[in-house]
Amino acid sequence: MMNMFIHKMLARICDYHDERCENIYSEFIKILFNSERDKYIAKMYRAIKIFIEDHDIDKYNNLFLYKYNVDVKEYINVVYFIIKEFTSMQDRIGSGECNIYEWGISSQDILNKLNIDIDKIDSILRMISLSYDEWILFLANNPSQKERFYFFRDKPLFAIDKNIYIPIDGRFLEELLFDTLRRMYEKLETKSNFSRTFGKSFERYILSLINEFCFYSKQHTYMGEFEYGPEPLRKKSPDGFIISEDGIVVIEV
């Protein structure tokens, strides 16, 4: 009884309750995952390691530039600046009443701090924002609640004026650095190929973090993937292992 009460309470917090749900434990775990909020600095680091430094992604970076007319480095720099600006804005403005335009950011604000062409900045802002007219038109044509969620997730800036933008949701804004960026790559013509390449790049990224952890640890040793068994039926081990005196952690990304 108490478990069901907790489930319904958490569901109400999320503004959604599935009456058909029978497994309250899996629903609880789902809510925890959906509520997870990564640090945006970690997202930026992850984006740089995968989308910029991993050369297997280079060919998709060219497609990204062709489709969006923006280099991925420019996109990451602009988005990070926007997040940083809004994050520090409350300390500068204070908690009292203020004009909504004080919370806004413009392409000129970004240009004053970053060495990026103003046309590129405007293109990025248009990619991640929506105007009032666009908002109304989309809601009229897409009554599905799920589609509304995805629309705001990918466009978390609201254009309150011709060149003034404010964030709709802080978490969605931070997700522009990695989660939304990945979906932008998936919209390229070679989605299936990108998904496979991204999976390998993400695996290398995760294993590099684990390897680095073990390198600086005095109690742990890292061992990577290896092949075993006779030819021609050789098999591959899991992706990695963390070895210590207490046991072994097997990693499969």
Predicted features by range, described:
Residues M2-F213:
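Interfaces and regulatory segments of ATP-dependent nucleotide/adenylate/phosphodiester-chemistry enzymes
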Residues F198-G199, E203, L233-R234, S244:
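Active-site-proximal structural scaffolding
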Residues E212-I243:
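A short acidic/basic microdomain associated with nuclease active sites
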Residues I242-V253:
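Active-site beta-strand-loop-beta-strand hairpin of nuclease catalytic cores
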